[in-house]
Swiss-Prot record:
<comment type="subunit">
    <text>Monomer.</text>
</comment>
<keyword id="KW-0456">Lyase</keyword>
<dbReference type="InterPro" id="IPR010663">
    <property type="entry name" value="Znf_FPG/IleRS"/>
</dbReference>
<feature type="zinc finger region" description="FPG-type">
    <location>
        <begin position="257"/>
        <end position="291"/>
    </location>
</feature>
<keyword id="KW-0862">Zinc</keyword>
<dbReference type="InterPro" id="IPR010979">
    <property type="entry name" value="Ribosomal_uS13-like_H2TH"/>
</dbReference>
<feature type="binding site">
    <location>
        <position position="104"/>
    </location>
    <ligand>
        <name>DNA</name>
    </ligand>
</feature>
<dbReference type="InterPro" id="IPR012319">
    <property type="entry name" value="FPG_cat"/>
</dbReference>
<feature type="binding site">
    <location>
        <position position="166"/>
    </location>
    <ligand>
        <name>DNA</name>
    </ligand>
</feature>
<dbReference type="InterPro" id="IPR015887">
    <property type="entry name" value="DNA_glyclase_Znf_dom_DNA_BS"/>
</dbReference>
<dbReference type="InterPro" id="IPR020629">
    <property type="entry name" value="Formamido-pyr_DNA_Glyclase"/>
</dbReference>
<dbReference type="InterPro" id="IPR015886">
    <property type="entry name" value="DNA_glyclase/AP_lyase_DNA-bd"/>
</dbReference>
<keyword id="KW-0238">DNA-binding</keyword>
<feature type="active site" description="Proton donor">
    <location>
        <position position="3"/>
    </location>
</feature>
<keyword id="KW-0479">Metal-binding</keyword>
<dbReference type="GO" id="GO:0003684">
    <property type="term" value="F:damaged DNA binding"/>
</dbReference>
<comment type="similarity">
    <text>Belongs to the FPG family.</text>
</comment>
Length: 291
Protein backbone atom coordinates (compact mmCIF):
# COMPACT_ATOMS: atom_id res chain seq x y z
CA UNK A 1 0.00 0.00 0.00
CA UNK A 2 1.34 3.48 -0.80
CA UNK A 3 2.62 5.51 2.11
CA UNK A 4 2.81 9.26 2.53
CA UNK A 5 5.68 9.92 0.05
CA UNK A 6 4.01 7.92 -2.72
CA UNK A 7 0.67 9.70 -2.25
CA UNK A 8 2.40 13.09 -2.14
CA UNK A 9 4.23 12.24 -5.36
CA UNK A 10 0.92 11.37 -7.01
CA UNK A 11 -0.62 14.63 -5.76
CA UNK A 12 2.19 16.68 -7.27
CA UNK A 13 1.85 14.82 -10.55
CA UNK A 14 -1.90 15.41 -10.76
CA UNK A 15 -1.77 19.10 -9.88
CA UNK A 16 -0.88 20.47 -13.35
CA UNK A 17 -3.80 18.64 -14.96
CA UNK A 18 -6.44 19.17 -12.28
CA UNK A 19 -5.83 22.13 -9.98
CA UNK A 20 -7.54 25.26 -11.22
CA UNK A 21 -9.44 23.43 -13.94
CA UNK A 22 -13.09 22.48 -14.33
CA UNK A 23 -14.17 18.85 -14.48
CA UNK A 24 -16.10 18.93 -17.75
CA UNK A 25 -17.29 15.38 -17.25
CA UNK A 26 -16.87 12.72 -14.59
CA UNK A 27 -17.55 9.10 -15.51
CA UNK A 28 -17.76 6.06 -13.22
CA UNK A 29 -17.58 2.79 -15.15
CA UNK A 30 -18.74 0.71 -12.20
CA UNK A 31 -20.91 1.24 -9.15
CA UNK A 32 -18.30 0.35 -6.58
CA UNK A 33 -14.61 0.29 -5.77
CA UNK A 34 -13.76 -0.85 -2.23
CA UNK A 35 -17.02 0.78 -1.21
CA UNK A 36 -20.07 1.64 -3.35
CA UNK A 37 -19.77 4.97 -5.14
CA UNK A 38 -22.45 7.47 -4.25
CA UNK A 39 -25.37 7.46 -6.66
CA UNK A 40 -24.81 11.16 -7.41
CA UNK A 41 -20.99 10.78 -7.50
CA UNK A 42 -20.51 11.83 -11.14
CA UNK A 43 -23.19 14.52 -11.00
CA UNK A 44 -21.58 16.23 -7.99
CA UNK A 45 -18.25 16.41 -9.80
CA UNK A 46 -19.27 17.34 -13.34
CA UNK A 47 -19.01 21.08 -13.94
CA UNK A 48 -17.06 21.79 -10.76
CA UNK A 49 -13.62 23.42 -10.68
CA UNK A 50 -10.84 21.82 -8.66
CA UNK A 51 -9.77 24.80 -6.56
CA UNK A 52 -7.07 22.91 -4.70
CA UNK A 53 -5.51 19.46 -4.58
CA UNK A 54 -4.18 18.49 -1.19
CA UNK A 55 -3.24 15.46 0.87
CA UNK A 56 -4.05 14.28 4.37
CA UNK A 57 -2.07 11.24 5.48
CA UNK A 58 -2.56 8.71 2.65
CA UNK A 59 -5.64 10.43 1.20
CA UNK A 60 -5.85 12.83 -1.74
CA UNK A 61 -8.32 15.68 -1.24
CA UNK A 62 -9.63 17.77 -4.14
CA UNK A 63 -11.45 20.95 -3.10
CA UNK A 64 -14.32 21.77 -5.46
CA UNK A 65 -15.93 25.09 -6.33
CA UNK A 66 -19.27 23.73 -5.08
CA UNK A 67 -17.93 23.52 -1.54
CA UNK A 68 -17.58 19.75 -1.73
CA UNK A 69 -14.40 17.74 -1.33
CA UNK A 70 -13.45 14.71 -3.41
CA UNK A 71 -11.61 12.20 -1.22
CA UNK A 72 -9.48 9.64 -3.08
CA UNK A 73 -7.52 6.65 -1.74
CA UNK A 74 -5.26 4.56 -3.96
CA UNK A 75 -5.71 1.30 -2.08
CA UNK A 76 -3.25 -1.48 -2.93
CA UNK A 77 -3.04 -1.16 -6.70
CA UNK A 78 -4.74 2.07 -7.73
CA UNK A 79 -2.98 4.50 -10.04
CA UNK A 80 -3.82 7.55 -12.13
CA UNK A 81 -3.00 8.15 -15.78
CA UNK A 82 -3.02 11.65 -17.19
CA UNK A 83 -3.71 11.62 -20.92
CA UNK A 84 -3.08 14.91 -22.68
CA UNK A 85 -1.83 16.48 -25.89
CA UNK A 86 1.74 15.63 -24.94
CA UNK A 87 0.99 11.96 -24.39
CA UNK A 88 0.31 9.86 -21.32
CA UNK A 89 1.90 10.11 -17.89
CA UNK A 90 1.35 8.25 -14.63
CA UNK A 91 1.87 10.36 -11.48
CA UNK A 92 3.65 8.51 -8.71
CA UNK A 93 4.98 5.68 -10.86
CA UNK A 94 5.79 2.75 -8.63
CA UNK A 95 8.01 -0.32 -8.89
CA UNK A 96 5.98 -2.83 -10.81
CA UNK A 97 4.49 -1.89 -14.20
CA UNK A 98 0.94 -0.66 -13.81
CA UNK A 99 -1.95 -2.64 -15.18
CA UNK A 100 -2.33 -2.22 -18.93
CA UNK A 101 -5.78 -3.77 -18.74
CA UNK A 102 -8.13 -0.91 -19.51
CA UNK A 103 -11.06 -2.88 -18.12
CA UNK A 104 -9.76 -1.69 -14.74
CA UNK A 105 -10.18 1.98 -15.72
CA UNK A 106 -12.96 2.62 -13.23
CA UNK A 107 -13.22 6.42 -12.98
CA UNK A 108 -12.42 9.09 -15.59
CA UNK A 109 -12.25 12.86 -15.16
CA UNK A 110 -12.37 14.87 -18.40
CA UNK A 111 -10.74 18.17 -17.47
CA UNK A 112 -11.08 21.61 -19.03
CA UNK A 113 -7.28 21.56 -19.19
CA UNK A 114 -7.69 19.13 -22.08
CA UNK A 115 -6.43 16.23 -20.02
CA UNK A 116 -8.23 13.01 -19.18
CA UNK A 117 -7.40 11.76 -15.68
CA UNK A 118 -8.05 8.02 -15.41
CA UNK A 119 -8.14 5.97 -12.21
CA UNK A 120 -7.15 2.33 -12.77
CA UNK A 121 -7.42 -0.17 -9.93
CA UNK A 122 -7.26 -3.93 -10.63
CA UNK A 123 -7.75 -5.00 -7.02
CA UNK A 124 -10.36 -2.35 -6.24
CA UNK A 125 -9.09 -1.60 -2.74
CA UNK A 126 -9.06 2.10 -3.60
CA UNK A 127 -12.10 4.28 -3.11
CA UNK A 128 -13.55 7.73 -3.73
CA UNK A 129 -16.12 9.78 -1.90
CA UNK A 130 -17.62 13.28 -2.23
CA UNK A 131 -18.62 15.13 0.92
CA UNK A 132 -19.18 18.77 2.02
CA UNK A 133 -16.05 20.57 3.20
CA UNK A 134 -18.02 21.66 6.26
CA UNK A 135 -17.94 18.00 7.36
CA UNK A 136 -14.18 17.50 6.98
CA UNK A 137 -13.62 17.39 10.76
CA UNK A 138 -16.18 14.62 11.16
CA UNK A 139 -15.47 12.65 7.98
CA UNK A 140 -14.89 9.08 9.27
CA UNK A 141 -11.81 8.43 7.11
CA UNK A 142 -10.09 11.60 8.34
CA UNK A 143 -11.39 11.91 11.88
CA UNK A 144 -8.86 10.95 14.51
CA UNK A 145 -5.81 11.10 12.26
CA UNK A 146 -2.65 12.23 14.00
CA UNK A 147 -0.42 15.11 12.92
CA UNK A 148 1.27 15.25 9.54
CA UNK A 149 4.90 14.20 10.08
CA UNK A 150 6.13 16.93 7.72
CA UNK A 151 3.87 19.60 9.18
CA UNK A 152 4.95 22.38 11.52
CA UNK A 153 2.94 20.91 14.40
CA UNK A 154 4.89 17.66 14.44
CA UNK A 155 7.85 17.76 16.80
CA UNK A 156 9.51 15.69 19.51
CA UNK A 157 7.22 17.07 22.21
CA UNK A 158 4.09 16.08 20.30
CA UNK A 159 5.43 12.60 19.58
CA UNK A 160 6.49 12.11 23.19
CA UNK A 161 3.06 13.06 24.54
CA UNK A 162 1.35 10.73 22.06
CA UNK A 163 3.54 7.82 23.17
CA UNK A 164 3.72 8.55 26.90
CA UNK A 165 2.63 5.53 28.90
CA UNK A 166 2.21 3.30 25.83
CA UNK A 167 3.42 -0.23 26.51
CA UNK A 168 3.20 -1.22 22.85
CA UNK A 169 6.33 -1.48 20.74
CA UNK A 170 7.74 1.66 19.20
CA UNK A 171 7.07 0.33 15.73
CA UNK A 172 3.43 -0.45 16.51
CA UNK A 173 2.94 3.04 17.92
CA UNK A 174 4.36 4.69 14.80
CA UNK A 175 2.06 2.64 12.57
CA UNK A 176 -0.94 3.86 14.56
CA UNK A 177 -2.41 6.61 12.36
CA UNK A 178 -3.72 8.34 15.49
CA UNK A 179 -0.15 8.91 16.67
CA UNK A 180 1.25 10.18 13.38
CA UNK A 181 -0.53 10.14 10.03
CA UNK A 182 0.76 8.63 6.81
CA UNK A 183 3.57 6.40 8.05
CA UNK A 184 3.69 2.77 6.94
CA UNK A 185 5.96 -0.22 7.31
CA UNK A 186 8.71 0.92 4.94
CA UNK A 187 9.36 4.35 6.40
CA UNK A 188 8.93 3.26 10.01
CA UNK A 189 11.66 0.64 9.53
CA UNK A 190 13.93 3.17 7.85
CA UNK A 191 13.30 5.94 10.39
CA UNK A 192 13.93 3.65 13.36
CA UNK A 193 17.22 2.57 11.81
CA UNK A 194 18.36 6.15 11.28
CA UNK A 195 17.40 7.01 14.85
CA UNK A 196 19.30 3.92 16.14
CA UNK A 197 16.17 2.74 17.96
CA UNK A 198 14.97 -0.85 18.22
CA UNK A 199 11.51 -1.55 16.78
CA UNK A 200 10.95 -3.68 19.90
CA UNK A 201 11.58 -0.77 22.28
CA UNK A 202 8.55 0.37 24.27
CA UNK A 203 6.90 3.48 22.87
CA UNK A 204 6.77 4.96 26.36
CA UNK A 205 10.55 5.47 26.31
CA UNK A 206 10.05 8.49 24.06
CA UNK A 207 8.81 10.46 27.08
CA UNK A 208 10.03 11.00 30.62
CA UNK A 209 7.78 11.02 33.67
CA UNK A 210 6.69 14.57 32.90
CA UNK A 211 5.78 13.49 29.34
CA UNK A 212 8.66 15.57 28.03
CA UNK A 213 10.60 14.24 25.02
CA UNK A 214 13.66 12.11 25.63
CA UNK A 215 16.67 12.13 23.33
CA UNK A 216 15.10 9.12 21.64
CA UNK A 217 12.07 11.22 20.65
CA UNK A 218 14.26 14.01 19.31
CA UNK A 219 16.31 11.62 17.17
CA UNK A 220 13.25 9.79 15.90
CA UNK A 221 11.39 12.96 14.94
CA UNK A 222 14.38 14.15 12.94
CA UNK A 223 14.75 10.73 11.29
CA UNK A 224 11.08 10.59 10.27
CA UNK A 225 11.25 14.01 8.64
CA UNK A 226 14.53 13.17 6.94
CA UNK A 227 13.47 9.83 5.47
CA UNK A 228 10.10 11.13 4.25
CA UNK A 229 11.67 14.21 2.68
CA UNK A 230 14.24 12.12 0.84
CA UNK A 231 11.59 9.67 -0.35
CA UNK A 232 9.37 12.43 -1.75
CA UNK A 233 12.35 13.93 -3.55
CA UNK A 234 13.14 10.51 -5.03
CA UNK A 235 9.55 9.94 -6.13
CA UNK A 236 8.48 7.36 -3.57
CA UNK A 237 9.36 3.75 -3.06
CA UNK A 238 6.36 1.43 -2.60
CA UNK A 239 7.30 -2.05 -3.57
CA UNK A 240 4.60 -3.66 -5.62
CA UNK A 241 1.85 -1.89 -7.49
CA UNK A 242 2.34 1.82 -7.07
CA UNK A 243 3.89 4.28 -9.48
CA UNK A 244 4.32 8.02 -10.09
CA UNK A 245 1.96 10.00 -12.30
CA UNK A 246 4.84 10.65 -14.72
CA UNK A 247 5.05 6.93 -15.46
CA UNK A 248 8.55 6.76 -13.98
CA UNK A 249 9.60 4.52 -11.12
CA UNK A 250 10.26 5.89 -7.65
CA UNK A 251 13.91 5.43 -6.75
CA UNK A 252 14.03 5.74 -2.97
CA UNK A 253 14.01 1.95 -2.72
CA UNK A 254 17.64 2.04 -3.87
CA UNK A 255 18.47 4.05 -0.74
CA UNK A 256 16.95 1.59 1.73
CA UNK A 257 19.27 0.98 4.66
CA UNK A 258 17.41 -1.98 6.15
CA UNK A 259 13.99 -2.46 4.54
CA UNK A 260 13.89 -5.59 2.35
CA UNK A 261 17.64 -6.14 2.96
CA UNK A 262 17.51 -9.26 5.12
CA UNK A 263 20.88 -10.99 5.30
CA UNK A 264 22.77 -8.07 3.79
CA UNK A 265 25.39 -6.01 5.63
CA UNK A 266 24.30 -3.06 7.73
CA UNK A 267 25.58 0.12 6.04
CA UNK A 268 26.58 1.53 9.43
CA UNK A 269 28.29 -1.27 11.37
CA UNK A 270 28.71 -4.06 8.85
CA UNK A 271 26.53 -6.39 10.89
CA UNK A 272 23.73 -8.40 9.33
CA UNK A 273 20.31 -6.90 8.66
CA UNK A 274 17.66 -9.16 10.15
CA UNK A 275 13.95 -9.64 9.62
CA UNK A 276 11.26 -10.76 12.04
CA UNK A 277 7.48 -10.67 12.02
CA UNK A 278 5.99 -8.03 14.27
CA UNK A 279 2.21 -7.60 14.53
CA UNK A 280 1.82 -9.52 11.29
CA UNK A 281 4.32 -7.42 9.33
CA UNK A 282 7.94 -7.90 8.39
CA UNK A 283 10.30 -5.75 10.41
CA UNK A 284 13.83 -5.14 9.12
CA UNK A 285 16.53 -3.89 11.48
CA UNK A 286 20.13 -4.10 12.65
CA UNK A 287 20.27 -5.51 16.20
CA UNK A 288 23.78 -4.12 16.67
CA UNK A 289 22.90 -0.52 15.77
CA UNK A 290 19.35 -0.30 17.06
CA UNK A 291 18.86 -0.43 20.82
Amino acid sequence: MPELPEVETVRRGLQPAMEGFRIDRAVAHRENLRFPLQKDFAARLTGQTVTGLGRRAKYLLADLSSGDVLLMHLGMSGSFRVIGADGETTPGEFHYPRSEDRTHDHVVFEMASGARVVFNDPRRFGFMKVFPRSEIETEPHLKGLGPEPLGNAFDASLLAKACAGKQTSLKAALLDQRVVAGLGNIYVCEALFRAHLSPKRKASTLANRKEEPTDHAVRLTEAIREVLGEAIKAGGSSLRDHRQTSGELGYFQHAFKVYDREGKPCPTCGGTVQRFVQNGRSTFWCPKCQK
